[in-house]
Amino acid sequence: MATPHINAEMGDFADVVLMPGDPLRAKHIAETFLEDVREVNNVRGMLGFTGTYKGRKISVMGHGMGIPSCSIYTKELITDFGVKKIIRVGSCGAVREDVKLRDVVIGMGACTDSKVNRLRFKDHDFAAIADFGMVRNAVDAAKALGVDARVGNIFSADLFYTPDPSMFDVMEKYGILGVEMEAAGIYGVAAEFGAKALTICTVSDHIRTHEQTTAAERQTTFNDMIKIALESVLLGDKE
């Protein structure tokens, strides 16, 4: 049954959904990687599609920017449409010297300056982590594709334009691989409603050096990340 934000019916979505922030990127993924594609959502322009990858039913849908937006969509997908696994596929900024442009980062855990998980968890710290099996399958898929993926903690920021750049020093000290804006929220929603989640990012810019990838470079690396996500789904089906 349709929700206020998703005009689909039960069965329209697969049990696994890939979620980029940008709905147009969701459209690109569907058109580039999936077969027998059909649109299943267009409310507020947040496009969603369902198709098949190597015969496996998979959906892809945008989640918007920031934890409030992605939390709405992931919650409704899980509770109203029977989705069991969410894979966020997006970009991140690096803060460490050894993390380079175009690196693929698998977010094993997600720190955050947002309070959303404290609201869920009676004002205590909640360890926002990805599902271990999904992490393992993504690592194995990356190896099979010849991609040297980084695995570790990322940081989900509430503010894109931070007023306190010194926080990047703290992130570097604690080994944060990349900064993005959604993973901690998605992991919290998945935990609350009994689903599984994973975030895979590509490094699109380096916050320290101010290096940025070109549009062509972003697309190539982005495609590597999507292949990892899709192949990891197939590996998960074998478990």
Swiss-Prot record:
**Which Gene Ontology BP annotations are present?**
purine nucleoside catabolic process
Task: Kindly list the residues the record flags as site (Important for catalytic activity).
Answer: 218
Q: Which UniProt keywords apply?
A: Glycosyltransferase, Transferase
Q: Where does a purine D-ribonucleoside bind?
A: 5, 180-182, 204-205
Q: Which residues bind phosphate?
A: 21, 25, 44, 88-91
The EC category is transferase
One MF term in the entry's GO annotations: purine-nucleoside phosphorylase activity
Sorted alphabetically, which InterPro entries does this protein's record hold?
DeoD-type, Nucleoside_phosphorylase_CS, Nucleoside_phosphorylase_d, Nucleoside_phosphorylase_sf
Sorted alphabetically, the Gene Ontology cellular component annotations on this record are: cytosol
Q: What is catalyzed by this enzyme? A: a purine D-ribonucleoside + phosphate = a purine nucleobase + alpha-D-ribose 1-phosphate; a purine 2'-deoxy-D-ribonucleoside + phosphate = a purine nucleobase + 2-deoxy-alpha-D-ribose 1-phosphate
Record-stated family: Belongs to the PNP/UDP phosphorylase family.
Q: Which proteins does it associate with, and in what oligomeric form?
A: Homohexamer; trimer of homodimers.
The record's NCBIfam families line, in alphabetical order, gives:
deoD (TIGR00107), PRK05819.1 (NF004489), PRK13374.1 (NF009914)
Q: What does this protein do?
A: Catalyzes the reversible phosphorolytic breakdown of the N-glycosidic bond in the beta-(deoxy)ribonucleoside molecules, with the formation of the corresponding free purine bases and pentose-1-phosphate.
Report what the protein is called: Purine nucleoside phosphorylase DeoD-type
Record organism = Klebsiella pneumoniae (strain 342)
Lineage, uppermost ranks: Bacteria, Pseudomonadati, Pseudomonadota, Gammaproteobacteria, Enterobacterales
